[in-house]
From Swiss-Prot:
Highest rank taxon of the organism: Bacteria
Record's compositionally biased regions (Basic and acidic residues): 47-59
Keyword field contains Nucleus: no
Protein name, entry field: UPF0482 protein CKO_01577
Signal peptide positions on this chain: 1-28
Swiss-Prot/TrEMBL keywords: Signal
Claim: GTP-binding is one of the keywords in the record: no
Pfam families in UniProt: DUF1283
């Protein structure tokens, strides 16, 4: 019985000590207050560097967009030409998918549908 009582007292003491340590660690020393408007020299420099990088990559972005637009226009024109070739009154005209052209079956030359 004495052994059980000492275990309970030891456990209670450990829980109390743990609670004290936990509650004291939860309180932080907040004696300093820093208010920053976001307009520091470092943030201005960072914004200037980002703007410079954005401007430097502008021409590259324009080239990529132009290339994508050209590829789209080429595919769109090929689709239209295929439709015209398949609906052509010329019976010898056929669509060549590898070259994306309308060709004559007899000569192999390009046909205007």
């Amino acid at each position: 019985m004495n052994n059980t009582l000492s275990k309970r007292l030891c456990l209670t003491a450990m829980l109390a000590l743990g609670a004290v340590v936990y509650t004291t660690s939860a309180f932080a020393n907040t004696s300093k207050l820093i208010i920053e408007s976001g307009d520091s020299a470092q943030s201005r420099q960072h914004a200037a560097m980002e703007k410079e990088q954005w401007n430097d990559t502008r021409s590259l972005r324009q080239k990529v967009n132009t290339r994508t637009e050209k590829e789209w226009d080429k595919a769109d024109a090929a689709f239209d030409n295929r439709d015209k070739c398949e609906q052509s009154a010329n019976l010898n005209a056929y669509w060549e998918p590898n070259t994306l052209r309308c060709l004559d079956r007899r000569t192999g030359r390009t046909v205007a549908p």
